[in-house]
A protein has these predicted regions:
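Conserved active-site segment immediately N-terminal to the catalytic lysine
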Residues: 159-194, 221-226
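PLP-dependent aminotransferase-like
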Residues: 71-136, 140-161
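Phosphate-binding glycine-rich loop
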Residues: 30, 35-81, 95-99, 105, ...
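PLP-dependent aminotransferase class I/II
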Residues: 8, 37-42, 47-54, 60, ...
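Short beta-strand-to-turn element immediately C-terminal to the catalytic PLP-Schiff-base lysine
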Residues: 183-184, 198-203, 243
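Structural detector of well-ordered beta-strand residues that form the stable sheet scaffold
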Residues: 54, 83, 104, 157-158, ...
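N-terminal "arm"/small-domain region of PLP-dependent enzymes with the aminotransferase-like
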Residues: 1-30, 35, 309, 349
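Pyridoxal 5′-phosphate
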Residues: 16, 76, 256
Length: 372
C-alpha cells in the first residue's frame, strides 16, 4: 500500500536530530517561554522574511489572534466583513465568526482552486475591511492584482499560510506578503510538529505585541492582565523539533515539486483534470504541494479504484463550509464552483518520502482509469 502520508517516515528522515533536540529540552527543565521557542521564532521570522514571529497553540489560534488583535487595536469592529475563499478549510472561517466578524464567501477559480481574483471587487461593500487570502493546497494565491485591489479599497491583507510553508512569490515568501499571516504546524503539514503548534508572522510591531499578549492570557507582564486573552503558546518541545525540521524545509519541498512536476507532465487521462497545470508548467506561480489535488467527475469511483490497486488517497474536503451544520444559515447560498470542487477533488500522495517507483505506479494507474 502506498500511504497518502506516513508521519513515521517523514520524521525518520531527521529522527536523530529531533531526538537530540527534544532531549535537550527535557534536560533543561524549562518547557514554556524558553530558549527553544525564542530561537525558532527568530529563525522562522528570518525564513519567512518578517520582523516578528509569535508562536502559538495552533493555526486556528493564529488566525483568531490576528483578528482579535486588530479588534483590540480598533482597526476591526463587530460586524465588519472579511472576504474569504468559499472552498477553504473551515478553520479559516471559524477564526472570523469567533471574533464577531462577518465572512463573505468568494467563489474559487476552477483552474487554480484559489480565490477567483476576478470576483473580489464585486463582493466589496462599505463594511468590507479585510481579505483573508488562503494559500490552499500549498499554491501561492497572492497576485499583484489581489494586492492592488486591497490597496485600492483600503483592505487588510491577511494570509492563511497553514498549507504553504516555504512557498514564494518572486523573491518573497508567503507569510510576508500581507499585513499579517497565520501558520499551522499540524503534524501533516510541510513543516509539521508532533502535536499542535502555530505561529503569526508580521512586520507590524504594534500588532505583534498585541498578538503575543493575547496569546498569553492577555498579559505582557507577569500577573498583569491588560486584555481578556487566552492560553495559546508554542511549547519548548514543539519549537525545538520544528527548528530542526525548518533547516530541511526547502529541500523537502523541492522533492514534492519534483513529484508534482511528473504528475503534471505524465498524467494523461481525459477524465482527470489537473488544476494549475498550465500555470505551473509555464512557471507562472509557485507551489509547495502540501496537497496535490486532482478533479474527476467520477471521484468516488476513482478513489475506490486506486484503493483496490494499493494507493491511499484523501479528499480535501468532502463538505464545503457553507454546507456544514455549524453554518446552517448559509445553506441557501449559491456557490456552484465551490460545490463542484468539493464533489470532484481527490488528493494524491505527494511528499518527500515517496520513491520514483511509487510515483510511476500512481501515474500508470491514473492513466489506466476508465480505459479497461
Amino acid at each position: 500500500m502506498i500511504e497518502y502520508l506516513s508521519l513515521q517516515k517523514i520524521n525518520a528522515l531527521h529522527e536523530q536530530e529531533i531526538v537530540e533536540a527534544v532531549e535537550k529540552v527535557v534536560r533543561s527543565g524549562w518547557y514554556l517561554h524558553g530558549q527553544a521557542t525564542e530561537r525558532f521564532e527568530r529563525h522562522y521570522a528570518d525564513f519567512i522574511g518578517t520582523r516578528h514571529c509569535i508562536g502559538c497553540g495552533n493555526g486556528l489560534d493564529a488566525l483568531t489572534l490576528i483578528f482579535r488583535a486588530y479588534k483590540e487595536l480598533g482597526v476591526l469592529h463587530d460586524g465588519d466583513e472579511i472576504l474569504v475563499p468559499a472552498n477553504t478549510f473551515v478553520a479559516s472561517i471559524l477564526s472570523i465568526t469567533e471574533n464577531g466578524l462577518q465572512p463573505i464567501l468568494v467563489e474559487p477559480d476552477y483552474e487554480t482552486l484559489e480565490i477567483d481574483e476576478r470576483l473580489i471587487e464585486s463582493h466589496i461593500t462599505d463594511r468590507t475591511r479585510a481579505l483573508l487570502l488562503v494559500h490552499l493546497y500549498g499554491r501561492c494565491a497572492y497576485t499583484d492584482e489581489v494586492a492592488e485591489q486591497c490597496r485600492r479599497h483600503g483592505l487588510l491583507l491577511i494570509e492563511d499560510n497553514a498549507q504553504a510553508h516555504g512557498c514564494r512569490y518572486g523573491n518573497k515568501r508567503t507569510g510576508s506578503l500581507g499585513n499579517a499571516a497565520a501558520h499551522s504546524f499540524y503534524p501533516g503539514k510541510n513543516l509539521g510538529a508532533m502535536g499542535d503548534a502555530g505561529a503569526v508572522t508580521t512586520n507590524d510591531d504594534q500588532l505583534a505585541q498585541m498578538v503575543r499578549a493575547l496569546g498569553n492570557y492577555g498579559s505582557s507582564r507577569k500577573y498583569v492582565f491588560d486584555y481578556v486573552g487566552r492560553n495559546s503558546r508554542l511549547d519548548e518541545i514543539q519549537a525545538a523539533l520544528l527548528d530542526v525540521k525548518l533547516k530541511y524545509l526547502d529541500e523537502d519541498n523541492k522533492r514534492r515539486q519534483q513529484i508534482a512536476d511528473r504528475f503534471y507532465r505524465e498524467i494523461d487521462n481525459p477524465r482527470i483534470t489537473l488544476p494549475g497545470k498550465r500555470r505551473w508548467l509555464n512557471g507562472e506561480e509557485d507551489n509547495v504541494f502540501h496537497i496535490f489535488p486532482i478533479l474527476c467527475a467520477d471521484r468516488d469511483a476513482l478513489q475506490s479504484y486506486l484503493k483496490e490497486k494499493g494507493v491511499q488517497t484523501l479528499i480535501h474536503y468532502p463538505i464545503p463550509p457553507h454546507r456544514q451544520r455549524c453554518y446552517a444559515e448559509w445553506g441557501d447560498l449559491s456557490l456552484p464552483v465551490t460545490e463542484r470542487i468539493h464533489r470532484e477533488e481527490l488528493s494524491l500522495p505527494c511528499n518527500q518520502t515517496m520513491s520514483d517507483n511509487e510515483t510511476d505506479l500512481i501515474i500508470d494507474l491514473l492513466n489506466g482509469f476508465g480505459r479497461s
